[in-house]
Amino acid sequence: MALTKLGNPEAKADRSLETFPIDDTSQEIRIDCREFTCRCPITGQPDWATIRIDYRPGGRGLETKSLKLYLETFREEGIFHEHLATLIRDDLVAALAPVQLTVTVNFNARGGIALAASSTYRREA
C-alpha cells in the first residue's frame, strides 16, 4: 500500500488506515492519542479522551497521520465509549494483522465519573 496521507496537506479525514512494512515483529509499539473527541450518543454532549494503542506488529506498522485523520472522523459521531474501543481495535486489526493489539480509551470525567475501556486482540497460534 502506498502512503498517500503523510506529507500531503490536502489529505482529508476518513476511516482508511495506512501501513508500511516493518521487519522486526518483536517490537512493542505504543501510540498515545491525547486529543480525541466524540459525542455522547444520547445527549450529543462532547466527550474527550486519550486513546492508547499498544501492538506487536505482524509485518506492518501503522502510519500515524492516517491514524490522526481516522480518529478525527469520530469528532461528531455519537458512540458509547465501550463500543469505541472495540471498533477501533477491529479496524486496526484489519489494517495491521498484528500479533497482538490492545486499544484503551480513557475518557475524561463527566458528572464526576471517568470511564476507561480496553479491547484486546491476540493472533491465534
From Swiss-Prot:
Pfam families: QueF (PF14489). It comes from the Bacteria. Keywords: Cytoplasm, NADP, Oxidoreductase, Queuosine biosynthesis. The active site is at C40 (thioimide intermediate), D47 (proton donor). GO terms for molecular function: preQ1 synthase activity. It is an enzyme of class 1 (oxidoreductase). The keyword Oxidoreductase applies. Belongs to the GTP cyclohydrolase I family. QueF type 1 subfamily. This is NADPH-dependent 7-cyano-7-deazaguanine reductase. It comes from Frankia casuarinae (strain DSM 45818 / CECT 9043 / HFP020203 / CcI3). The gene is queF.
